[in-house]
A protein has these predicted regions:
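Active-site mouth loops of central-metabolism enzymes
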Residues: 2-16, 37-39, 65-78, 97-98, ...
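Metal-associated gating/positioning segment near the N- to mid-region
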Residues: 2-59
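Histidine-centered catalytic micro-motifs
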Residues: 1-7, 123-128
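Alpha-helix-loop-beta-strand connector modules within alpha/beta enzyme cores
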Residues: 45-63, 67, 111-125
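Gly-rich Lys/Arg/Thr-decorated short loops/hinges at beta-loop-alpha junctions or inter-strand turns
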Residues: 2, 30-35, 61, 65, ...
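Divalent metal-coordination and catalytic microenvironments
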Residues: 1, 25, 29, 64, ...
Length: 189
C-alpha cells in the first residue's frame, strides 16, 4: 500500500499527490498503486471514495485502486455502507489503534472484524497502544525531551507488542484474518 494526497489530521496533506506519486512508481516499474481512501469522522466512506477518485482522475499515470480507512464505524457504516463498498470491489480496509483522529476501541474493531468475516474482506490494522504512547509522551515532555530521538522512546517495543497481540486475539475471537501493518519490532512478530 501507499499514501498519496492523504490528509493527515493536522490540516496537512501527504507530500506526494497522484501525479508525483504515480510518476515515481512508474519510474520504478510499478504499474498499479493502492493508496487509501480515508473516512473522516462524521463523514461517510462513500464520500471518501468519491473524494479520492476526484484526486486521482486525470492525474494518475498508472492504474490505481483504493483500500479504505474506517474511522467512524456507525451502525449505518457497518450494516449498509461498508458491505455495499465491499460488494463493489473495495475488499480491504485499514483501521488504527492509535492516533486520536483515527483510533478505534476494541468493540469497534470487533464490529468491523465481524463485517470483514461476513463479507470476506481483509482488515489491515495499525497496532500501537495509544494510551501507552500518550503516557510515555507526557513523561518525555515533562522532562523537556523533545528532540526527534525521543520519538522512538515514546513507542517502546512493548507498546507495539501489546497492541499487535491484542489485535491478533480479537481476530482469533472472530476467526478472521488480519494484516498487521507497519511492524517495527521483533517482539510484535
Amino acid at each position: 500500500h501507499c499514501h498519496l494526497d492523504q490528509p493527515t489530521g493536522d490540516d496537512s496533506v501527504m507530500a506526494d499527490d497522484f501525479e508525483s506519486g504515480t510518476r515515481s512508481a512508474a519510474c520504478g516499474g510499478t504499474t498499479t498503486v493502492m493508496p487509501f481512501a480515508g473516512q473522516q469522522r462524521g463523514g461517510t466512506l462513500q464520500d471518501a471514495v468519491d473524494d479520492y477518485h476526484r484526486r486521482a482522475e486525470g492525474r494518475a499515470l498508472i492504474d490505481y485502486a483504493f483500500h479504505l480507512i474506517v474511522t467512524d464505524p456507525t451502525p449505518h457504516v457497518l450494516e449498509h455502507e461498508l458491505p455495499a463498498l465491499i460488494a463493489r470491489g473495495y475488499t480491504s480496509f485499514k483501521i488504527y489503534m492509535t492516533y486520536d483522529a483515527l483510533k478505534l476501541d476494541d468493540r469497534q474493531i470487533l464490529d468491523l472484524l465481524a463485517v470483514a468475516r461476513r463479507e470476506k474482506a481483509m482488515t489491515m490494522i495499525h497496532a500501537e497502544n495509544a494510551d501507552c504512547i500518550a503516557w510515555l509522551t507526557e513523561r518525555m515532555l515533562e522532562r523537556g525531551f523533545t528532540a526527534p530521538q525521543y520519538h522512538a522512546l515514546s513507542r517502546l517495543p512493548v507498546v507495539e507488542r501489546e497492541a499487535t497481540h491484542r489485535a491478533i486475539s480479537l481476530s482469533e475471537l472472530l476467526d478472521t484474518p488480519v494484516l498487521i501493518v507497519h511492524v517495527s519490532g521483533r517482539e510484535a512478530i
